[in-house]
A protein has these predicted regions:
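A short structural micro-motif
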Residues: 28-29, 49-50, 91-96
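Hydrophobic packing positions characteristic
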Residues: 88-161
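Short acidic alpha-helix initiation/capping motifs at coil-to-helix transition points
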Residues: 18-23, 59-68, 99-101
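A general alpha-helix detector
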Residues: 4-8, 25-28, 66-73, 85-89, ...
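Amphipathic alpha-helical packing elements
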Residues: 56-94
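Membrane topogenic helices and adjacent juxtamembrane segments
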Residues: 1-41
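Membrane-interacting alpha-helical segments
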Residues: 33-56, 100-119
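RNase III-family endoribonuclease catalytic core
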Residues: 4, 48-49, 60
């Protein structure tokens, strides 16, 4: 059950929404995870601790950093809509990638799919995204040293419209 505890803690850290649900209804943890009584009590205590909000912020900052560093004009062009589209992206892809170019490339592909599906974004988004996505893709190709190249699955983006 330790694995379930660890997964629950990771999920809670990655999802402020899940933390809020658990604060209001701690039984959510028992419904989603196989926990001992002790593990459940610890997680409920962690979620209720004021520091948990900071843990969630740090997690999200780490997910946002590759985007802010690699596609800054796209982020700026999204303006106030950045928060909503990034939150949707994180919901669609709950597990980040520590390779900044892979994470940025995946977000670019996510946003490209939303644009292709008719998503409504400021006019500056499409040209900024096209320019920066090409730069990220080239940097990603140059940075990979694995025998098997990174190939994102197109099915990952089918439901992102």
């Amino acid at each position: 059950m330790l694995v379930e505890f660890q997964q629950a803690l990771a999920d809670l850290t990655a999802s402020p929404e899940l933390c809020i649900r658990v604060r209001f209804d701690p039984s959510v943890l028992q419904q989603r995870y196989e926990l001992t009584d002790r593990e459940w009590r610890r997680l409920v205590g962690i979620v209720r601790h004021p520091g948990m909000a900071c843990a969630c912020m740090v997690y999200r900052a780490n997910r946002l950093a590759p985007l802010a560093l690699n596609i800054p004009q796209t982020c700026r062009a999204l303006g106030d809509g950045l928060r909503a589209v990034v939150s949707e992206y994180w919901t669609t892809f709950p597990e980040g990638n520590i390779h900044f170019f892979i994470e940025a490339d995946r977000f670019c592909r996510f946003l490209e799919a939303k644009l292709a599906a008719g998503g409504s974004f400021p006019a500056e988004v499409a040209p900024a995204l096209a320019r920066e996505a090409a730069i990220v893709a080239a940097a990603l190709r140059e940075s990979l040293t694995e025998a098997t190249p990174y190939e994102p699955s197109p099915t990952n983006f089918a439901g992102s419209g």
